[in-house]
Every structure is written in structure tokens, then in C-alpha cells.
């Protein structure tokens, strides 16, 4: 715990007070541990704490949020707008993070964003930024895109026209829909062939 505090102190000292710091515990803590750790990190003004406990633990997130005052970010591990509605209604989340590849594509992503808007909550789509950027631009409550190293279609090399992030910003393609053009040859290199092994027959 002390090591986390020293890391936060060092980073905050390095970047200064105006740069938002987002923390992700990757569901590693119990609610009690999350409260202790978040309380110790709060002096460094974290912008959000993402999934401090098991993602499905709605009431635990409510408890951690109320006990610490640190904004809770979650959503990458939720799959339906009904789950999102449950968490929003309970007051378990401050920043909503739907993943377009998990919630069912553009239509569901936009429904979740509209639902979040009704709770006055911002949306920061998780992962696959090339697919999410058009949707984000259509969200009145869109915050920004969350990107991960190696997690973009451009980095995977499957786009005929890569979309670049410049100084932390990207522009959506001018074409409708997701607007991206895949490179068929590059996609072929990622093709999975063969069949999955059959489960053993019950004895």
C-alpha cells in the first residue's frame, strides 16, 4: 500500500496538479481494502478509480464510492444495458465505460450512453478506439476514449487507412458508420482455421 502511495506521489509531482490521473485496480481488492487504499490515494486527486473490486459487485462499488468520495469508473466488464442501468440506478458509478465489442455494437453502445445521459453521467468508451470514435462524437455526454497499448486496430495493422492519434486526439473518418476500411490481406493473417477440440464425452 505504501508503494502505491509513493508511486502516486511521484507521478503527481512529475505531471503537476492539472493532469488527470486514472487508476485501475483490475478488480483485485476487497471492498474494505479498496476503501483503505482509495482513502490513502485521495490526497493525490485521482480522476477515477476503475474496477477496484469485482466488477459485478454493485453494492460493493456503492459502498467504496460513498466511503471514499473517489469517482468510480466501470463498465468494461458489463455486457447489457440492463446491467448498466442497475449500476447507475444504485449510484455505483461516476464514469461509464462500455466496451463496443462486448455490449453488442454501435446501437447498444449508444443506448447505454443515452441511459447514462439521463443520470447525468459521462461516458468514456473502453478499447477499440477506431470503432468507438464516431459513437463518442455523437454523445452529448461523451468524455474521451480509453486506449490501451497494443489494443487498437491501427496497431494490429489490419486497417487499409490507419487512424492516427496525434497529441492525444483523433478525428473520426469522414465515411458513415464506423468509417474504417479493413485490409483484407492483413485480416487474412489473423484468420483462425481448424476446429476447436471437442469436449470429452461424459463417462
Protein language model annotation of sequence segments:
Residues 1-68:
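Metal-dependent enolase-superfamily TIM-barrel catalytic cores that perform enediolate-based chemistry
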Residues 1, 27, 99-102, 176:
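Short loop or secondary-structure boundary microenvironments that flank
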Residues 159-203:
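C-terminal extensions of enzymes
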Amino acid at each position: 500500500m505504501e508503494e502505491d502511495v509513493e508511486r502516486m506521489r511521484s507521478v503527481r509531482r512529475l505531471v503537476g496538479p492539472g493532469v488527470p490521473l486514472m487508476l485501475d485496480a483490475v478488480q483485485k481488492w476487497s471492498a474494505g481494502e479498496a476503501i483503505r487504499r482509495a482513502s490513502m490515494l485521495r490526497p493525490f486527486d485521482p480522476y477515477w478509480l476503475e474496477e477496484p473490486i469485482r466488477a459485478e459487485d454493485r453494492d460493493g462499488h456503492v459502498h467504496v464510492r460513498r466511503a471514499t468520495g473517489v469517482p468510480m469508473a466501470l463498465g468494461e466488464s458489463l455486457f447489457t444495458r440492463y446491467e448498466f442501468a442497475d449500476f447507475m440506478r444504485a449510484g455505483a458509478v461516476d464514469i461509464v465505460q462500455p466496451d463496443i465489442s462486448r455490449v453488442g455494437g454501435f446501437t447498444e453502445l449508444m443506448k447505454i450512453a443515452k441511459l447514462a445521459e439521463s443520470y447525468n453521467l459521462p461516458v468514456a468508451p473502453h478499447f477499440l478506439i477506431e470503432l468507438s470514435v464516431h459513437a463518442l462524437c455523437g454523445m452529448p455526454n461523451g468524455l474521451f476514449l480509453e486506449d490501451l497499448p497494443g489494443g487498437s486496430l491501427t496497431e494490429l495493422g489490419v486497417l487499409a487507412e490507419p487512424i492516427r492519434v496525434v497529441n492525444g486526439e483523433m478525428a473520426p473518418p469522414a465515411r458513415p458508420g464506423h468509417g474504417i476500411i479493413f485490409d483484407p490481406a492483413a485480416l487474412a493473417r489473423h484468420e483462425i482455421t481448424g476446429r476447436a477440440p471437442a469436449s470429452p464425452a461424459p463417462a
